[in-house]
Amino acid sequence: MNVSANDLAGLKVMVIDDSKTIRRTAETLLKKEGCEVLTAVDGFEALAKISDQKPAIIFVDIMMPRLDGYQTCALIKNNPQFRATPVIMLSSKDGLFDKARGRIVGAEQYLTKPFTRDELLGAIHRHVSTVSNH
C-alpha cells in the first residue's frame, strides 16, 4: 500500500488500551504519519476525552478492566454525537464470536493484535472518508 507521507496529517486518532506497549506502538506508528494521537487506558478515561477532543477514528482494545471494549464501543455508538465515528476493535484473539460481538455493538472493523503498520493505516483509510481531503 502506497500511502503518501502527509495525507493523515492532523487527523485525530484515539487508541484505548490498558497495555502501555500497545498504546506506545500505535502512537509511534501514527505520529510518524502525522496523526494527532490521543490515548486512554480504559473506557472511562476514553469517554471523557472523546467528548472533549472528538477523534476522527477510535481503536479500542476488547479486554480492559472496568469497562471492556464492547461496552466502550456501545457507549460511543449510543451517543448521537459520536455514532458516525468509526470504532475499530483490537483483540489478541481472532475468534468469530468476538468479531460478531464487535459488529453487534457497532464496531466497523476488527484487528488482531499484534497489528501491523499497514493494518492500522489501512483501517484508517477504509473508514475515515476525510483522509484525502480533510
Regions found by a protein language model. Give the residues of each.
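Charged docking surfaces used in two-component/phosphorelay signaling
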Residues: 24-32
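Active-site beta3 strand of CheY-like receiver
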Residues: 53-59
